[in-house]
Amino acid sequence: MSAYKLLEIKLKSFIENTIDLNKNDVEKAYKSRDNLIKNITEILNENLFFNVYEERNLNYGSFENGTKILELDDIDIMICIKANYRTYYDLFPNNIIKIIANYYDIYFKNECLDNETIFLNSTKLLNLLKNELAKIDDYEKADIHKNKEAVTLKLKSYKWNFDIVPCFFTMPEYDGREYYLIPDGEGNWKKSDPRIDRENIDKLNETQLNIIKLIKYWNKKKKITTMKSYILECMLLEYFNEIKNDISIYYMFKKALKYIYENIFCHICDPKNIQGDLNKLNKEERISISEKAKKCYIICNEAINLIERNNYNEAVNKFSEVLNDFNG
């Protein structure tokens, strides 16, 4: 068997055994999530303020999309609340969403309103949701997520947390698009639509999904803490549009590193076409990421040169300088 083929097999094995989530954990996590959504719906529907729009609840994020890598630490859920005659408007040009309260909010749940206004405050709503979640069996604790867009729920029986985002679902706007309205971290609301992210991931083949996982692993092990997982995925979606899909994992991985070090200085487009440029990194952060990616790209080239000379073991050792534990 050629050194090329051996390297490809080892990379796939590395992904399956070192990077991918444990299959038993995944099965257990799916069941725990579905059961939790059922429990949350039952509890919230007892509170007239929260009338759950079950058909629009949404599982999203890297766990749902199949791009999560070890360890499984969080699962994302959106719990949709029925509008019940609440309305909203968009404050241009900052795209801040204001939700106008309904009769019940104003007269019976005014603790969720901005002070002396009729606007629904997303931070206050998160706190109300946090208090309601304490009624769940197996509850351990709940806190407002650091981005103030979700409630992080910890249950006693599982090692992973659940990040729960309360949301509303809009009617079609003038352009025909529908949106989820989620907390923006400042007490207001913002538009989102994670369904688009899922559609984009569903179009990828197995090799492309493996590249996402490898790059996430590289990002994590190389301590590039300024690179958020979602930003990486968006960059790689753009990269996949520029490269042939019929090449090996190691060539695609090498070229992905090249794409990162060349394009981290550029705009990173929001695939949902809502937020505009996602690249909020400062100059120093971009330079640091670019230098690390370029260094690893050069090492990958050296490894591939060794493969071309049929030096498989030396090539594996060289790749392990980029992917920790690869030669383990």
List the predicted regions and their residue ranges.
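N-terminal regions immediately upstream of nucleotidyltransferase
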Residues: 1-72, 83-115, 328
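Terminal (often C-terminal) interaction modules
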Residues: 1-18, 35, 268-328
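Intrinsic-disorder-associated interaction segments
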Residues: 4, 22-25, 29, 118, ...
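Catalytic cores of NTP-dependent nucleotidyl/adenyl transfer enzymes across multiple folds
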Residues: 6, 32-38, 110-266, 324-328
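Short, flexible loop/turn elements at secondary-structure junctions
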Residues: 61-64, 79-83, 155-157, 166-168
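Short, solvent-exposed beta-strand-terminating loops
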Residues: 77-94, 167-174, 178
